[in-house]
Structures are given as C-alpha cells and as structure tokens.
Amino acid sequence: MGAESGRSDMASAEQVVRDFCAAASGGNPDAMRAFFSDDVVYHNIPMAPAEGIAATMELIDGFMGMFEKLEFEIHHLASDGPTVLTERTDHFTLNGKTAPLPVMGAFHVVDGKITAWRDYFDMGQVTAMLSGD
C-alpha cells in the first residue's frame, strides 16, 4: 500500500467518524446504526461493553431516549490508519436544561463501518446529570 492510499484510508476513517458524530447530534438512532458493522463493539468504559449491532443499538436507543437532545461537539480529532480519536464535549438536554460532558472517544473503522467505539468519561458527571444536580 502506497503513502497515497494510506492517506486516503485515514481521511475516509476520519470522515466516517465526523459523519457519525453529526448523525448522533441529529438525535436519530437509526441514522447512527448505518455507521456500524454487524459485529461492532460499543464500550462506555465505566460500563460493560455492548457486543454486536443489536446490543449496541439497544444501549443507544435507551440512552438517547432519556434525553430531549444530544449534540456531539468535536474539539480535536486525530487518526492513525483505521483508528480515530476524538476529544469531544457531548451536550445532553434533559428537562430543558443542557449539561456538557467531556468525552474522549476512540473509534476503529474498517471498510467505511465503525467496528469499535469506546468512550471515556466521568460516570459521576452522568449520574449527577440524571439526578438533576
């Protein structure tokens, strides 16, 4: 594989993640589903991983159903081949109040599909957000 091809793969993996984050911000879980491989592993690091598209979508549907709005704000994005890292603030709106959550995300993209997604964040902030603190 030549250097040109490597740059193209990196650019496409980055674009997949950018497009995925935009779809997540749209609040439509079905739009997010289109970005996942069938064997995707989604792991919010403070919790147990969801393995496979059905388990991943069950987790996303449940989580997104708790909020009126979700927006992924990407601050920095870096990639190395199929691996894409995002430094984000995820903004969750609940009962008309928006709460920011700093997140570090790691994605693995193969053939234009996300095969792994890990998010690192402070679970205490999520608990406080859900309890209205």
Task: Describe each PLM feature range.
Residues 1-34, 38, 133:
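Short, low-complexity N-terminal intrinsically disordered segments enriched in polar/charged residues
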Residues 32, 80-83, 107-114:
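Short, solvent-exposed coil/turn segments at beta-strand boundaries
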Residues 85, 99-101:
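Anionic, Ser/Thr-rich low-complexity intrinsically disordered regions
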Residues 86-94:
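Short beta-strand segments that buttress and anchor functional surface loops
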Residues 106-128:
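Short beta-strand edge/turn micro-motifs at domain boundaries
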Residues 60, 72-77, 89-90, 102-107:
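Hydrophobic/aromatic beta-strand elements that line small-molecule binding cavities or substrate pockets
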Residues 29-33, 37-82:
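A solvent-exposed, acidic/Ser-Thr-rich amphipathic alpha-helical stretch
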Residues 96-98, 126-131:
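A short, polar/proline- and glycine-enriched secondary-structure boundary/capping micro-motif
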